[in-house]
C-alpha cells in the first residue's frame, strides 16, 4: 500500500500540473496547525517566484481543481498562498479497511530486494558481570534488528563477545595464583583436560576485577598477564582449554541475562573467532603496500584530502606484534564477508568510539576487505545517566549490575500492579500472575525508557518516571493495549464474532475517531523511516501518539453500549487494528503486553 501522505501528494501534484505549474510544487506535509487542517501544501509560495504571480492566485486555482476530489473533505486556499487539506472520512475508512486486510503488514510493503544485514551488538567482555552500561547496545541493537526483519531483510545478530586480549591473560594469571596446582598450568601435561570448569561464574566474576586491580598497582603481575595473553594467543594448550571453560561458563550466564532482556542472537561469536584470519590479512596489507611501519607499529594511513580534522592511522599491530581492537574488528569483517557476505554491517557501540570506527571502516575499504557495495554503519549511543546527570551508579557510588537494576524495577512494578488491583477492588490475579505481569511491564519500562530517546543522546534513567502508568512510558503503552484487549474480550463474551469483521470500518462519526484513523495511517511511513535511520525512538513517538489518539477516542465514544450494531462493529474493527499495530510496534521494540494489568 502507498503511504497516505504520498497518495495525497500525488493528487495535489496532478492538480498543480493541470493548473499549468511544475509538479515539484505539489509536495504535501502534515499540518503544523492541526486546529485548522490535517495536511498542508506550501508549494504555491515557492511557485509564485517562478511564475511571477501572487501565491494565492496559484493556490486558488489548485484548490478549485481539488474541490470535487473524493479523497478530500475540503481543500482550502488560504492567503498568502497555503493549501489547507482535510481528509474525506469515507476515503479514510477505506484506507483503514485496506490496512486491516493486509494482515501482519498493515499497508507496509516488504523490501523488494532483501538485504543481508549483520548487527554487531558489541557484546561485553566474558567473565565480567553485566552492568548497566551493557544495557544500551543490547536494547538498541535488538530493536534495530527486529525493525529490519519486519521490513523483510535477512538479519543476523552477533553478540560479538570480548574474549581476546589482555583480560584473558589477567584471568589466567589470577587463577594461577589462586589454584597453581591446576593441570592447565603444567606445560609438560599431554593428556585430556577436565570437562568441568575449575571455577563457577561467581568465582569468575570475582577473579577479573581482582586481577584488573592488581595489574594497575603490581607491575610484575601485569607483565605475567601480558605473557599469559601472548602464550594464549600463541596456542598454548592449557590456556586454550581454560579459554574454552571461561567461554562456556560465561556464555551460559550471558544467555540467561540476555533472555531476561528478551534479546536473542543468531551468532554467539567472539573476538577469538576472528583470530585465525589475522595473519593472512596482515600479510595481504603488507604485500599490497597498504601497511607500513610507523614508530615501531604496523599501520595503515586512512586520512583523506577532505578531512577537516586529523584522522590518525589505523594501527594493525603494536610494536610487540600484539593485535588491537582494530585488528580484531578488521579480521571479523574478513570472516563476515566470507561467511555471510553482508550488504550492511551495523555496529552498536558508545558514541565516544566514533574515531575507532572511522579508522576501521576506512581501512576496510582501502584494503579491499569490504567492497563499496557493503555499507558499514556505526550507531553511536549516548550515556545512561542518573538523576544527577552523571553516569548511573549504585547508592554507594559503584557501577550497578544489570540484573540488580532489573530486579529493582521488577519489584517497583509489582508493587504498583498490586496497588492498582486494590484500587480497582479486583483481587482475582494470583501472586504468580502478578509477578509475571510485573516482569513483562518492567521490561517495557526499561526498554521504552531507553528507546524513546534518540540513540545518540545521553538520557536520565529515572525509575519513578519509567514505571509510571501515565505519560510517555512503556507501562502507559501496555495499559492502553490491555484496555483494548479488555473491550474486545467483553465484546466476544456478549456473543460478538471478531473474526467475522470484514471491511467493517465505517466513516468516522466524531473527531476522536478520525484522529485515531489518521494516527493509524502513519504506520507504514513511521516504520520505513525508523528502518532507514536506525531510529527506534521514532516508533516510540508514534505509539505514544497512537495510544493518546485511542484513549481520546475511547473517552469520547460509547463503544460496547452503541445501539447501532454496524457502528459497533466498525468501532470494534478499528480497535482490533489499533491493538495489532501497537503489538507489532512493541514487538519491534523488543517487549510484549500482558493480557491483564
Regions found by a protein language model. Name each.
Residues 1-93, 111-597:
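Non-catalytic interaction-recognition regions
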Residues 94-99:
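Short, charged, solvent-exposed linker or helix-capping segments at domain edges/interfaces
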Residues 100-112:
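Flexible, low-complexity linker/hinge segments
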Amino acid at each position: 500500500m502507498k503511504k497516505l501522505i504520498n497518495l495525497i501528494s500525488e493528487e495535489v501534484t496532478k492538480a498543480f500540473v493541470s493548473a499549468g505549474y511544475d509538479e515539484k510544487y505539489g509536495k504535501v506535509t502534515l499540518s503544523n496547525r492541526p486546529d485548522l487542517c490535517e495536511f498542508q501544501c506550501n508549494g504555491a509560495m515557492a511557485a509564485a517566484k517562478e511564475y511571477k504571480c501572487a501565491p494565492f492566485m496559484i493556490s486558488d486555482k489548485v484548490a478549485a481543481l481539488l474541490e470535487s476530489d473524493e479523497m478530500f473533505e475540503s481543500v482550502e486556499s488560504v492567503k498568502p498562498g497555503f493549501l489547507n487539506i482535510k481528509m474525506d472520512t469515507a476515503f479514510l475508512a477505506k484506507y483503514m479497511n485496506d490496512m486491516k486486510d493486509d494482515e501482519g503488514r498493515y499497508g507496509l510493503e516488504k523490501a523488494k530486494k532483501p538485504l543481508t544485514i549483520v548487527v554487531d551488538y558489541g557484546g561485553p567482555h566474558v567473565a565480567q558481570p553485566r552492568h548497566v552500561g551493557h544495557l544500551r547496545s543490547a536494547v538498541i541493537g535488538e530493536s534495530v534488528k527486529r525493525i529490519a526483519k519486519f521490513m523483510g531483510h535477512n538479519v543476523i545478530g552477533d553478540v560479538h563477545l570480548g574474549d581476546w586480549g589482555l583480560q584473558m591473560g589477567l584471568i589466567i594469571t589470577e587463577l594461577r595464583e589462586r589454584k597453581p596446582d591446576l593441570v592447565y598450568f603444567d606445560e609438560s601435561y599431554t593428556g585430556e583436560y577436565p570437562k568441568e570448569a575449575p571455577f563457577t561464574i561467581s568465582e569468575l566474576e570475582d577473579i577479573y576485577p581482582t586481577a584488573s586491580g592488581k595489574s594497575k598497582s603490581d607491575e610484575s603481575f601485569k607483565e605475567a598477564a601480558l605473557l599469559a595473553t601472548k602464550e594464549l594467543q600463541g596456542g598454548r594448550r592449557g590456556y586454550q582449554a581454560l579459554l574454552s571453560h571461561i567461554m562456556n561458563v560465561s556464555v551460559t550466564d550471558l544467555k540467561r541475562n540476555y533472555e531476561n532482556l528478551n534479546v536473542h542472537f543468531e551468532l554467539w561469536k567472539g573476538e577469538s573467532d576472528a583470530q585465525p584470519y589475522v595473519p593472512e590479512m596482515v600479510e595481504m596489507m603488507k604485500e599490497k603496500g597498504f601497511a607500513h611501519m610507523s614508530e615501531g607499529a604496523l599501520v595503515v594511513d586512512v586520512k583523506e584530502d577532505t578531512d577537516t580534522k586529523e584522522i590518525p592511522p589505523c594501527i594493525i599491530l603494536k610494536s610487540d606484534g600484539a593485535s588491537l581492537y582494530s585488528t580484531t574488528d578488521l579480521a571479523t569483517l574478513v570472516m563476515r564477508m566470507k561467511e555471510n557476505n553482508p550488504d550492511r554491517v551495523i555496529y552498536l557501540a558508545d558514541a565516544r568510539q566514533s574515531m575507532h570506527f572511522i579508522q576501521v571502516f576506512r581501512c576496510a575499504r582501502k584494503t579491499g576487505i569490504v567492497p563499496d557495495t557493503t555499507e558499514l554503519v556505526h550507531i553511536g549511543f549516548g550515556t545512561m545517566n542518573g538523576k544527577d546527570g552523571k553516569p548511573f551508579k549504585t547508592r554507594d557510588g559503584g557501577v550497578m549490575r544489570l540484573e540488580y537494576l532489573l530486579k529493582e524495577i521488577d519489584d517497583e512494578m509489582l508493587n504498583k500492579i498490586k496497588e492498582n488491583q486494590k484500587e480497582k477492588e479486583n483481587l482475582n490475579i494470583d501472586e504468580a500472575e502478578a509477578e509475571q505481569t510485573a516482569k513483562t511491564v518492567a521490561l517495557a519500562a526499561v526498554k521504552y525508557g531507553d528507546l524513546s530517546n534518540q540513540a545518540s543522546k545521553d538520557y536520565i534513567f529515572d525509575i519513578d518516571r519509567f514505571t509510571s502508568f501515565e505519560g510517555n512510558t512503556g507501562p502507559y503503552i501496555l495499559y492502553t493495549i490491555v484496555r483494548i484487549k479488555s473491550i474486545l474480550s467483553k465484546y466476544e463474551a456478549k456473543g460478538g464474532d471478531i473474526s467475522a469483521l470484514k471491511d467493517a470500518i465505517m466513516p468516522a462519526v466524531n473527531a476522536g475517531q478520525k484522529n485515531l484513523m489518521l494516527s493509524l495511517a502513519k504506520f507504514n511511513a513511521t516504520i520505513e523511516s525508523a528502518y532507514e535511520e536506525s531510529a527506534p525512538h521514532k516508533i516510540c513517538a508514534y505509539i505514544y501518539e497512537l495510544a493518546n489518539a485511542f484513549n481520546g477516542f475511547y473517552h469520547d465514544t460509547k463503544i460496547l453500549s452503541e445501539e447501532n450494531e454496524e457502528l459497533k462493529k466498525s468501532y470494534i474493527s478499528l480497535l482490533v487494528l489499533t491493538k495489532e499495530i501497537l503489538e507489532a510496534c512493541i514487538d519491534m521494540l523488543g517487549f510484549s503486553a500482558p493480557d491483564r494489568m
